[in-house]
Regions:
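Residue(s) in the substrate-gating loop at a strand-loop-helix junction
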Residues: 130
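Substrate-binding pocket helix/loop in short-chain dehydrogenase/reductase
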Residues: 83-87, 91-99, 196
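Conserved glycine-rich cofactor-binding loop
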Residues: 12-13
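Conserved Rossmann-fold SDR core element
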Residues: 23, 162-179, 226-232
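Short C-terminal tail/terminal secondary-structure segment
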Residues: 84, 223, 228-245
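Active-site helix of classical SDR
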Residues: 110, 146-147
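A conserved structural motif in NAD(P)-dependent oxidoreductases
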Residues: 200-211
Length: 245
C-alpha cells in the first residue's frame, strides 16, 4: 500500500479516523474528509484535509476535484440516528435524512471515485455498511434500509459496472457490528452491552481499529487483488439470534 493515495470519508469519526491512521501506517498518502469535525480530522496528520457535505452533489464533485487522482476510497461517512423509533412513529423527515446521510452520501462518493477510476484505469473502493443492513435493527428501520441498500444492490451493481471502464477495479464492503465510537458512546450502557453481546460468540464490542484493519485488507491489491463484490462482517461472529441467556 506504500505510496497509494487514499481518500477516507468521515475521517473525523471513530471508524473513519481509525481507517485514516491505518492507511498512514501502511505508507499511504491519505486525503482525510470531514463534514463538521475539522479539528479532529486535522489532528490526524493526513497529507490533505478536505471538508464537504456528502449529501450535496456539488460539494462531492468539488471534493474529488481537490483530492486529485486516487488509488483507493474508503467510504466510511454515515450517521446512525441514536433515538429508537418504530416505523409507525417514524417521521418522513427522519427517514429521508437518514437515507441522505448514508445511502445518498455513499452513492455520490462511489460515483465520484469510480469516475476517477474510469480515467486512471484502476481503483479499489471499500464501502462501510452495517450489521443493521444484514439483520435489520428494530427502532432504526431507516438506517437498516440505507445500509442494506449499500451492501446489497449498490455493491453488487458497482462491482459489475466498474470493470467496463477499469478492468481491474474492485468494490467491496465492510459491515461493522456494535463498535465503540463517538457515534455509539451514549447508547452502549451496561444493559445494552449485555444484550447485544448475547448474539456474538466473541462476546465483545469491536474497536474502530478492528474495522479499519479489514478496510485496509480489502483495499490492498496484494492481499485482495482477486476479491470484489464481497462483504466482510466485523461483528464478533454476530448472528441474528441469541446465542446465550
Amino acid at each position: 500500500m506504500a505510496g497509494k493515495r487514499v481518500l477516507v470519508t468521515g475521517a473525523s469519526g471513530g471508524i473513519g479516523s481509525a481507517c485514516a491512521r491505518a492507511f498512514m501506517e501502511e505508507g499511504c498518502e491519505v486525503v482525510a474528509h470531514y463534514h463538521l469535525g475539522r479539528e479532529r480530522a486535522g489532528a490526524l496528520g493526513a497529507a490533505v484535509v478536505l471538508g464537504a457535505d456528502l449529501t450535496v452533489e456539488a460539494e462531492v464533485e468539488r471534493l474529488f476535484e481537490e483530492a486529485g487522482p486516487l488509488d483507493v476510497c474508503a467510504a466510511v461517512a454515515g450517521v446512525w440516528p441514536s433515538e429508537d423509533v418504530p416505523v409507525w412513529e417514524l417521521p418522513l423527515e427522519r427517514w429521508e435524512q437518514t437515507l441522505r446521510t448514508n445511502l445518498t452520501a455513499t452513492f455520490l462518493t462511489a460515483r465520484g471515485f469510480l469516475r476517477g477510476a474510469a480515467r486512471t484505469g484502476h481503483g479499489s473502493l471499500v464501502m462501510v455498511g452495517s450489521t443493521a443492513g444484514l439483520f435489520g435493527e428494530a427502532g432504526h428501520a431507516d438506517y437498516a434500509a440505507a445500509k442494506s441498500a449499500i451492501v446489497g444492490g449498490l455493491l453488487l451493481s458497482l462491482k459489475n459496472e466498474v470493470v467496463r471502464v477499469a478492468p481491474r477495479a474492485r468494490v467491496n464492503a465492510v459491515c461493522p457490528g456494535w463498535t465503540h465510537s463517538p457515534m455509539t458512546r451514549g447508547s452502549l450502557d451496561a444493559e445494552t452491552l449485555r444484550r447485544v453481546t448475547r448474539t456474538m460468540p466473541l462476546e465483545k464490542v469491536a474497536e474502530p481499529e478492528d474495522v479499519a484493519a479489514q478496510v485496509v485488507v480489502l483495499a490492498s491489491d496484494v492481499l485482495s487483488g482477486h476479491v470484489t463484490g464481497q462483504i466482510v462482517t466485523v461483528a464478533g461472529g454476530m448472528e441474528g439470534r441469541l446465542l446465550r441467556d
